[in-house]
Amino acid sequence: MTALPRYSVFGNPVAHSKSPQIHQQFALQEGVDIEYERICADIGGFAQAVSTFFGTGGCGANVTVPFKQEAFHLADEHSDRALAAGAVNTLILLKNGKLRGDNTDGIGLANDITQVKNIAIEGKTILLLGAGGAVRGVIPVLKEHRPARIVIANRTRAKAEELAQLFGIEAVPMADVNGGFDIIINGTSGGLNGQIPDIPPDIFQNCALAYDMVYGCAAKPFLDFARQSGAKKTADGLGMLVGQAAASYALWRGFTPDIRPVIEYMKAM
């Protein structure tokens, strides 16, 4: 009997990951059977865990916190997206045995905004809140959609300015944000502790979409604040999660899943 194609997600912690359910839905669309497991790698043991997985028949892997930068250094070659982001969330085993690193986070975000939420990015003004790895990973793809302007705001200005210089966008301290934006994206992790970014409510007055890159309860504080402050539409990051997973699946298998029914399936869980 032929073994099923094996995939995984590496993280620490990783027990909460919804990736196995998402990828099994993609496999149903393709009409194939796959194995997809969560692997909690020890801090300091990521490289060995990856080597063991691929050495025992693994075909592809997703990578989540805190290993995305380490995965970047582990990969033998990189996509342009991964090089720009400096982080890898997808590892692909090539026919020559080498590992190729890619970053599909930006694709997941942009596809959710443009295809599922039906809001164009081209010609729009975008405010990014936060300057960590999550934000850095999505800037290259957002720029490909040719927005009129991207502004990055962070509590510590130096980190925002570093990304602004790297990607040719604007930076401001979070407390100094003013003016209306079409799309406001929260890439901070404060919602996990019930906190919202220190921004004035009037920036949401002409906001077509307020988006939090996290999903579920952690997104609620920011999205509630945005809605109460005038944002026309709000969304958490579930669509981004499904979208980046679909892009990974396509890289591994050459089959592009339809993300809409999978988003609805995950909402109903």
Swiss-Prot record:
Residue numbers binding shikimate: S17, K18, S19, T64, N89, D105, Y215
Highest taxon listed in the record's lineage: Bacteria
MF term (GO), any: NADP binding
Active-site residue list: K68 (proton acceptor)
Annotated catalysed reactions: shikimate + NADP(+) = 3-dehydroshikimate + NADPH + H(+)
Binding site for NADP(+): D80, G130, A131, G132, G133, A134, N154, R155, T156, R157, A158, K159, M213, G237
CC annotations in GO: cytosol
Keyword NADP: yes
Enzyme Commission number(s): 1.1.1.25
One record GO biological process: amino acid biosynthetic process
Pathway it works in: Metabolic intermediate biosynthesis; chorismate biosynthesis; chorismate from D-erythrose 4-phosphate and phosphoenolpyruvate: step 4/7
Keywords, sorted A to Z: Amino-acid biosynthesis, Aromatic amino acid biosynthesis, NADP, Oxidoreductase
InterPro entries: Aminoacid_DH-like_N_sf, NAD(P)-bd_dom_sf, SDH_C, Shikimate_DH, Shikimate_DH-bd_N, Shikimate_DH_fam, Shikm_DH/Glu-tRNA_Rdtase
Family: Belongs to the shikimate dehydrogenase family.
NCBIfam families: aroE, PRK00258.1-2
The protein's assembly and partners: Homodimer.
Role played: Involved in the biosynthesis of the chorismate, which leads to the biosynthesis of aromatic amino acids. Catalyzes the reversible NADPH linked reduction of 3-dehydroshikimate (DHSA) to yield shikimate (SA).
PANTHER family documented for this protein: BIFUNCTIONAL 3-DEHYDROQUINATE DEHYDRATASE_SHIKIMATE DEHYDROGENASE, CHLOROPLASTIC, SHIKIMATE DEHYDROGENASE
Protein name: Shikimate dehydrogenase (NADP(+))
Upper lineage: Bacteria, Pseudomonadati, Pseudomonadota, Betaproteobacteria, Neisseriales
Gene: aroE
